C-alpha cells in the first residue's frame, strides 16, 4: 500500500502533510512554500495555473482567476450567500443545468468540485515529488459544519483529481488530533477555527488516545474572505467620496483592491497602522487617479467587529450542546489564519475566560491532523480513536410540511437509526421520502438533500401501512437513506445525492478531462522547457559567433548560421519535438566553434604559463596527434 496523504483543502490556502515514521510532516510545494494558495487561473492561451503562479497574475487577469471557490462547493445558484458573492468577485458565477452554482471562464463552465480538484492535483503532485512515488489515496478535511452536499462535492473533487478519498475529516477534529497526539494531557478542549471562508467550533474530550467530539457548530460562510471584502467596500466607498468614481465597476481595480485589503489585514495583526498605496488605480478625463490611505488597526477592527461577534453565538451553542460551561474548557486551540488577528484572540479570551493556546501553527495544524488520520487508517499510528459527530440534524418531511428528526445533531458517527411512518391517505400506494438536514421546525426552511419514492404499497386505510425509514451516516458524514414497507418487504434506498450535485457521469467526464489536461499540461511544460533550452543555445551561439566566428571555416560558420535560423523559425511554433530536433542540429553544428574557443583558451593559458615560468626551464614532450589518432 502506498502512502496516504493528508490534505487541508482550504478556502484561501491549502496544505499537504504525510506521516514520516511516527511524525507528521508538512510538505513544501515546488515554489518552496508550506501552503499553496487555493487559486486557479486560465491564461489567454488556455494554460491552467494553480497556486502561487495563479495568484501572481490575478491583478492582470481578474475574470479568469478563480479564488475562494470552496464557498460555492455544494451550493445552489439561488442560495442567498451565493447571491452576495456574485457582486464581490470579479469572475463569473453561473447557474449549472442542475441548479448548482458553477463558475464560467471564456464561455466554459466548471463545477466548484472541478476547480477544487485542480488544487488537489497540485497537492498530490507536491506529495509525489517529495515522496518519489505515486500517491492515489488521501484524507481530506472539510469544515465541521459542512452539510451532506458539501461533503459529497469535496469527495467528488478528490475523485476528479485522481485520489481515492479514504476519509473526509472535520477540520477542528483534525486540529485536535495534531494538538493532542503527543500530549499526556487529558481533558476537554475547544477548537476555535476561523479560516479563509468558514468558521467552526468543536468541543472535544481527549484522553488515552481517544478524541471524542462532544459538539460542533459554525458558519460555512464566515471567514477571512468576508474581512477582506469588508475592507474592499470601505476603500471603494472612500475613493468614491473623494474622486466620484465607483471602483466596483472596474474588475481590474477590484482585484487590486482585494490584494491590498488582504495585505493590510495581515500587516495590522502585527502593527497598529498601515498605508494602502495603489497608484494609477483608475483614470478619468482629468487624468490618472491614485488611491493612498492610512488605515489603523482600530479602524479595521471597527469595520469588521460584527463579523468577529458572529463567532460568539456558535461557541455558546456548542458549549450548551456539550452540556458544559466556558469555565469547564481546559484549553482553547486557535486554528485558521484569521485567529492571528488580535481582536479575534481578545474575543476568544473574553468568551472562554482564558488565554487561547497558540502553540500550533494555525495554517498547518489541520493538514497535520489529516496526515495523522491517514496514519491511523494505514496502521502506522496506533492507539488513536477518533469519534466525530454529525453537525446537523437529519430527518424527513412529514404531514403538513413538518421536519421530523431521525438523527439529532452532534450524534456520534458512524450511526444508524430507524423510525416507522405511515400513509396520509386511504389506499395510498406510494410515498415520497424527502430528506432534509438542518435545525428548523418546518422542512422547507432546512436544506433538502434529496428525495425518492417507495412504490407498490398494498391498498389499506391511512395510518395502517408501516414504512420504516432508516438513516445511515458513514464515518465521512455522508448519508444513506432507505425506506421499507414492513408488510411486503419492498425496499428503496439511495445514497443521498442532492437535487443538484454531480452525477457519476459528470464525475467520470471530469476525471477524463483532468487526465487529458494532465497530458496537455505535460506537453505544454515540455514545450516551455524545450523553448527555454533552445533560446539559451541561440543566445550563446550568436554571442560565440560574434566573438570567435573568424576562427572557423566559412562553410562551418554558414552551417551554424543556418542552424540558428532554422531553430529561430521552430521557436515561433509550439512543436516541442521540432524544437528539440533543431536544437540538437544546432548543438552538433556549433561543436567546431566550441573547439576553436577551447583551442584559443588553451593557447592563451600556455602563453601565460610561459611568461610566468621564464626563469625556470621546463622539459616537455610533444605528442604526435596523428599517431595518437591512429592508435586510438
Swiss-Prot record:
InterPro entries with a match to the protein in the record: ATPase_NBD, Chaperone_DnaK, Heat_shock_70_CS, HSP70_C_sf, HSP70_peptide-bd_sf, Hsp_70_fam
Induction, as annotated: By stress conditions e.g. heat shock.
Listed PROSITE patterns: HSP70_1 (PS00297), HSP70_2 (PS00329), HSP70_3 (PS01036)
Annotated region (Disordered), positions in chain: 524-557
Modified-residue entries (Phosphothreonine), positions: 198
A Pfam family per the record: HSP70
Matches recorded under CDD domains: ASKHA_NBD_HSP70_HSPA9
Keywords assigned: ATP-binding, Chaperone, Nucleotide-binding, Phosphoprotein, Stress response
GO molecular function terms listed in the Swiss-Prot or TrEMBL record: ATP binding; ATP-dependent protein folding chaperone; unfolded protein binding
Xref: NCBIfam families: PRK00290.1 (NF001413), PRK05183.1 (NF003520), prok_dnaK (TIGR02350)
Function (record text): Acts as a chaperone.
Recorded family membership: Belongs to the heat shock protein 70 family.
HAMAP family: DnaK
PANTHER family membership: HEAT SHOCK PROTEIN 70KDA (PTHR19375)
Protein name: Chaperone protein DnaK
Originating species: Nitrobacter hamburgensis (strain DSM 10229 / NCIMB 13809 / X14)
Gene field: dnaK
Amino acid at each position: 500500500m502506498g502512502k496516504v496523504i493528508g490534505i487541508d483543502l482550504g478556502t484561501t490556502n491549502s496544505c499537504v502533510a504525510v506521516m514520516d515514521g511516527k511524525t507528521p510532516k508538512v510538505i513544501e510545494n515546488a515554489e518552496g512554500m508550506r501552503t499553496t494558495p487555493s487559486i486557479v487561473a486560465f491564461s489567454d492561451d488556455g494554460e491552467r495555473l494553480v497556486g502561487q503562479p495563479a495568484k501572481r497574475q490575478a491583478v492582470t487577469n481578474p475574470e479568469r482567476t478563480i479564488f475562494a471557490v470552496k464557498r460555492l462547493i455544494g451550493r445552489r445558484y439561488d442560495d442567498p450567500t451565493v447571491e452576495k458573492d456574485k457582486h464581490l468577485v470579479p469572475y463569473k458565477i453561473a447557474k449549472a443545468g442542475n441548479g448548482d452554482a458553477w463558475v464560467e471562464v471564456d464561455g466554459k463552465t466548471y463545477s466548484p468540485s472541478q476547480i477544487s480538484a485542480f488544487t488537489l492535483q497540485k497537492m498530490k503532485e507536491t506529495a509525489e515529488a517529495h515522496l518519489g512515488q505515486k500517491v492515489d489515496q488521501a484524507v481530506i478535511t472539510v469544515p465541521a459544519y459542512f452539510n451532506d452536499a458539501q461533503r459529497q462535492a469535496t469527495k467528488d473533487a478528490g475523485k476528479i483529481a485522481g485520489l481515492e478519498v479514504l476519509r473526509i475529516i472535520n477540520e477542528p477534529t483534525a486540529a485536535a488530533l495534531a494538538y493532542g497526539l503527543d500530549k499526556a494531557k487529558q481533558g476537554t478542549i475547544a477548537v476555535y477555527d476561523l479560516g479563509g471562508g468558514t468558521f467552526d467550533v468543536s468541543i472535544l474530550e481527549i484522553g488515552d488516545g481517544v478524541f471524542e467530539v462532544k459538539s460542533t457548530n459554525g458558519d460555512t460562510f464566515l471567514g477571512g474572505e468576508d474581512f477582506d471584502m469588508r475592507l474592499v467596500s470601505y476603500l471603494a466607498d472612500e475613493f468614491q467620496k473623494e474622486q466620484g468614481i465607483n471602483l466596483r465597476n472596474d474588475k481590474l481595480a477590484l482585484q487590486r483592491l482585494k490584494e491590498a485589503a488582504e495585505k493590510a489585514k495581515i500587516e495590522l495583526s502585527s502593527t497598529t497602522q498601515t498605508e494602502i498605496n495603489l497608484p494609477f488605480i483608475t483614470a478619468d478625463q482629468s487624468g490618472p487617479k491614485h488611491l493612498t490611505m492610512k488605515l489603523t488597526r482600530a479602524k479595521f477592527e471597527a469595520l469588521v467587529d460584527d463579523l468577529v461577534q458572529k463567532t460568539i453565538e456558535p461557541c455558546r451553542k456548542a458549549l450548551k450542546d456539550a452540556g458544559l460551561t466556558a469555565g469547564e474548557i481546559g484549553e482553547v486551540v486557535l486554528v485558521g489564519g484569521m485567529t492571528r488577528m488580535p481582536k479575534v484572540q481578545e474575543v476568544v479570551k473574553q468568551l472562554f475566560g482564558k488565554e487561547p493556546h497558540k502553540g500550533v501553527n494555525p495554517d498547518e495544524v489541520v493538514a497535520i491532523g489529516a496526515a495523522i488520520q491517514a496514519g491511523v487508517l494505514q496502521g502506522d499510528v496506533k492507539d488513536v480513536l477518533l469519534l466525530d459527530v454529525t453537525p446537523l440534524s437529519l430527518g424527513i418531511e412529514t404531514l403538513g410540511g413538518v421536519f421530523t428528526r431521525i438523527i439529532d445533531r452532534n450524534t456520534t458517527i458512524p450511526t444508524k437509526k430507524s423510525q416507522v411512518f405511515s400513509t396520509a391517505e386511504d389506499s395510498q400506494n406510494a410515498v415520497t421520502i424527502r430528506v432534509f438536514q438542518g435545525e428548523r421546525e418546518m422542512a422547507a426552511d432546512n436544506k433538502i438533500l434529496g428525495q425518492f419514492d417507495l412504490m407498490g404499497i398494498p391498498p389499506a386505510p391511512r395510518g395502517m401501512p408501516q414504512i420504516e425509514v432508516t438513516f445511515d451516516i458513514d464515518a465521512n458524514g455522508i448519508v444513506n437513506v432507505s425506506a421499507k414497507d414492513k408488510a411486503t418487504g419492498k425496499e428503496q434506498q439511495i445514497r443521498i445525492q442532492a437535487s443538484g450535485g454531480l452525477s457519476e457521469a459528470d464525475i467520470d467526464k471530469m476525471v477524463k478531462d483532468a487526465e487529458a489536461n494532465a497530458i496537455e499540461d505535460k506537453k505544454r511544460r515540455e514545450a516551455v522547457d524545450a523553448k527555454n533550452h533552445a533560446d539559451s543555445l541561440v543566445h550563446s551561439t550568436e554571442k560565440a559567433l560574434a566573438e570567435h566566428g573568424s576562427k572557423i571555416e566559412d562553410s562551418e560558420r554558414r552551417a551554424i548560421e543556418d542552424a540558428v535560423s532554422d531553430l529561430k523559425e521552430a521557436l515561433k511554433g509550439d512543436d516541442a519535438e521540432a524544437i528539440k530536433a533543431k536544437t540538437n542540429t544546432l548543438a552538433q553544428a556549433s561543436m567546431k566553434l566550441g573547439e576553436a574557443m577551447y583551442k584559443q583558451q588553451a593557447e592563451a593559458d600556455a602563453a601565460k604559463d610561459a611568461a610566468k615560468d621564464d626563469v625556470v626551464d621546463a622539459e616537455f614532450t610533444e605528442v604526435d596527434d596523428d599517431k595518437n589518432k591512429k592508435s586510438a
